Amino acid sequence: MDHSKSDFTQGSILKKLTLFMIPVLGALILQAAYGAVDLLVVGRFGTTAGLSAVSTGSQVLNLITFVVTQFAMGITVLIARYIGEKKMNSIGALIGGATVVFAIISAIIFVVMIMLASPISTLMQAPKEALGLTATYVRICGAGIFFIVAYNLLSAIFRGLGDSKSPLLFVAVACVINIIGDLVLVAGLHLDAAGAAMATVFAQAISVVFALMLLFKRKLPFKITKHDFKINPHCVQALKIGLPLALQECLTQISFLALCAFINRLGLEASSGYGVACKIVNFAMLVPSSLMQSMASFVAQNVGAGDEKRAKHAMFTGMGIGLIIGVVVFISVLFKGDLLTSIFTTEKAVILQGYAYLKGFALETIVTAVLFSMVGYFNGHYQTVWVMVQGLIQTLLVRLPLSYYMSIQPHANLTNIGLAAPIATIVGIILNVCFYIYLSKKMKKENA
């Protein structure tokens, strides 16, 4: 690994942030494609019930994946901070302790998803025609949760080291295997939603094996010994950083599950249309998401090196990048959303329902560029409790109540329900601007 390229404390901010962000974005694109392939193949070669099952079941899997990713953010930020502070000896202990913690988390999730797959599907209000298939999808994905958690842990480690290219390779391997698996199991053997779930698990397993091989061959600036594999102060510190983010993400994703349940009550076509729209949304949100992940590592290194001015400059640079791309995505989603949804299904009613949701959601692709850049900046400063608070306000006090209100109107439609997301984000921006002003004054006073 060329450590000069992973040093964010000097050189052009725009160049270094962009070069680090591009592989992160590439990995996120492939992850979104990874999930989209399941819907695409099931939509083309499976049943409408199978499509609904993958749509609803993938919401549950997304909940688990996003929560684990936020837990892992604590590891990414802390590794980057140690690098900025030149504390290389602490990194091995952090990784060893984190491995133990994530193994425990995996075991808990495994038991819950296997034992409670049917109640979870019922709670999600999956259409009765798709209830059994949804439970099967959740159960199979639960069986492979160890691989999903391991992938996110390994990716967090590499990104903390300033290496965003390796996680891109990991997910590229998984994406290729998943496509092959879907074509064989769904298109070839007609296993419908179950086949999509099996392909997902197998692809993640191969990806983890590849990642471990790469890690063992890599020359790293630290050592890991068997004595590091225990719960220690370093992994506890990472948990303190990641836990608020994980809690916030958990409740945010639960709100999306609740939204899925609200929409499921509108019928099978609305359920399937929303599922297809979510895949488009996943792609649309990739740039702000990659900005947030990249910003956390970039800012953490500079904070560790004592360069707050550079950290702030990085945040505003990220906003500029995100806004430019966000406008392009906004126009595409708003005016060509029906063409995008038609990629995943040939059923006209489902295409129109998906496009209806995208019309309401479209503004989110612009405003999130600002919000996520600020969130990444705060994460790099260890201000994860605030990130949790502002996220919960958006989720529990704005997005969820507004979505529910829209869903119970006499002529409820997906466009109005989709509006809840950008409205909540705008509220979040206002809150974060206020906190940014407060934090800047506090740091200025402390350094006076």
Residue spans for each PLM region:
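Short alpha-helical transmembrane segments in multi-pass integral membrane proteins
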Residues: M1-M21, I79-F146, G188-L243, V299-E364, ...
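N-terminal transmembrane alpha-helices
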Residues: F8-L40, R44-F45, Q59-M73, L78, ...
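Transmembrane helical elements of multi-pass membrane transporters/channels
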Residues: L19-D38, I140, A174, A203-S207, ...
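Transmembrane alpha-helix boundary and packing residues in multipass membrane permease domains
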Residues: V24, L28, L40, V77, ...
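Residue-level hotspots within pore-lining transmembrane alpha-helices
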Residues: G26, L30, Y34, I64-V68, ...
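Helix-terminus/linker motif at the lipid-water interface of multi-pass membrane proteins
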Residues: I29, A33-S52, S121-K128, V184-L191, ...
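Small-residue-rich hydrophobic transmembrane alpha-helices
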Residues: L51-V111, I148-P167, G273-I331, F335-G337, ...
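Short runs within selected transmembrane alpha-helices of multi-pass transporters and secretion channels
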Residues: A72, C141-R159, P167-C175, A196-V209, ...
